[in-house]
Every structure is written in structure tokens, then in C-alpha cells.
């Protein structure tokens, strides 16, 4: 399925409108949230999570989704408040700590003064390390795949934050651990988009520029890759490349990613309700096909 078909396929707003909020299970709210986050409907995803929490007040995963959606929508400070409450309540889940760390990373990025940058970088690293420490790399040599799948994300972000904060040695040490985790997962038959771009980022941090660019390029061509995922990956890759202060490295990383465009649509209703039909309904599917062809 193409990225365009994935984006246009579900009518998420209609699905949300039709959801029976009084009878819906927490799982139904979560599934809808996931769909919306996947295609970049972050504010709508937050609305769904909030509605779900009104009915399922203690649901940890719905709280996680609400915070995740807020972060993605550009409100990381509000997200930290939700997640810090979960942690204060005894939540030691890897996902909670990873999301909290990610929100602090966003605050680090948005901060303009040095003091705030240092503060949020330290908070982000501490939370990523908390997530990673639930099953440290040293104890994962004989670990099952499920454990490994929770570790590559905090590990690569520890590497990223150290590297961007100027501690290149610590950054590369964690990058090598992340690369090894990805290798283990690949050997076990698990190698999705996020694992592949994590491997690419580790290679970039370690200075293997050609291999990193090749791995990024391969990941963006995967059938399941989403434009929002590629944009996020590209942004972080360019941040790392800029640290090297070498235009050739930056150019190499830029060329590894496709150019993502923005489509703006405008128009008016051809045939108003109750008026005689002027546009033949049988032509609608052909027009849709032509538009999709042009966008692809």
C-alpha cells in the first residue's frame, strides 16, 4: 500500500464521530489514537485520549497517548505534567519514561538560553537512562526479542543527547550499544522502519557516513514508512550531521532522504444540496485516481 493510500484510507474524523464514547472500551480509544498519531492528526488524537480518560480514568496507556499527542502537537511542557504524574504514582514502564524523556528533549530543543538547554538535556538523559536501565544492555546478551525491542529507542536517544550536548565519547559509546541491539533484533528477524533508522543514526554518530546514508535511504523506501516518520528521522539526522561541521557530510545525509512536499487544496462545492447534479457521480472515482497519480 502506498503512503498516500495509507493517509487517505481511513476517514478518521468520521470514525471518531461514530465511536460510541459511552460504551467504547479503552482499547477502542487506544486504537483510534494510534491511527491518528500515525498520520499526524495529533490534536485529534489528544481529544480521543482525553475522552477515553473521562470513562477509563486510571488507564495508563491512554494517559501515555494523551501525552504523546501533546508532545507531537508542540506542547511538551503539558505532556511532562501528565507523565511525571504517572511516574510519581509508581509507573516504571519503559514507554512512560521514554515519552517523558522525549518531551524533555523537545523542551531542550525549543530552549534558547544556555541554562535551560543544560537543564532539559540533563532531564532528558536521566529519563532515557531510567527507561534503558529497566533492562540494561549487559543483561540483554541472552534476552528475548521483546526485551530488546524496548531498549533501542532510549539507548539511541541517550547517544543523541550526549552527542548534541558535546560529550561525543559518551554519545558514541551509547550509539555502539544501540547498533548492537539493532543487529541482535535483525538477527532474530525483527527489522522494521524504526529499528533500521536507529541503526542508521548509530552509524552516523559513530562516523560511518556512507553506511549511515545507505541505511537511511533504504529505510525511507520501506512500504510501511510514513511521511511523518521520515520527517522526524530526517530532522534528527541533520542535527547530528551539523555537529560535524563538514558540508560533505551534511549533503550526504540530505541526499539520503526524499523531498517531502506539502499539498494545499482549495475549492468549492460544485453541486449544492438539493440542486441539480452537474458533476457526473460516475466520474468521481476516475478524478480521485488521477489526483492520487499526480500526488504520487
Report each predicted region and the residues it spans.
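Amphipathic alpha-helical repeat scaffolds of TPR domains
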Residues: 1-35, 55-72, 91-112, 136-138, ...
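Helix-turn-helix repeat elements of alpha-solenoid scaffolds
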Residues: 2-13, 34-47, 68-84, 116-129, ...
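A conserved position within tetratricopeptide repeats
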Residues: 16-20, 46, 50-54, 80, ...
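Internal alpha-helical scaffold/solenoid segments in large eukaryotic proteins
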Residues: 39-52, 60-83, 125-129, 147-161, ...
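Eukaryotic intrinsically disordered, low-complexity segments enriched for acidic and Ser/Thr/Pro residues
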Residues: 41, 246, 251, 257-293
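Alpha-helical linker/edge segments of TPR/alpha-solenoid repeat scaffolds
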Residues: 73-79, 107-114, 160-173, 201, ...
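TPR/TPR-like (Sel1-like) alpha-helical repeat modules
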Residues: 163, 176-180, 209-227, 255-258
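Structured C-terminal portions of repeat-based eukaryotic scaffold domains
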Residues: 174-180, 184-198, 202-205
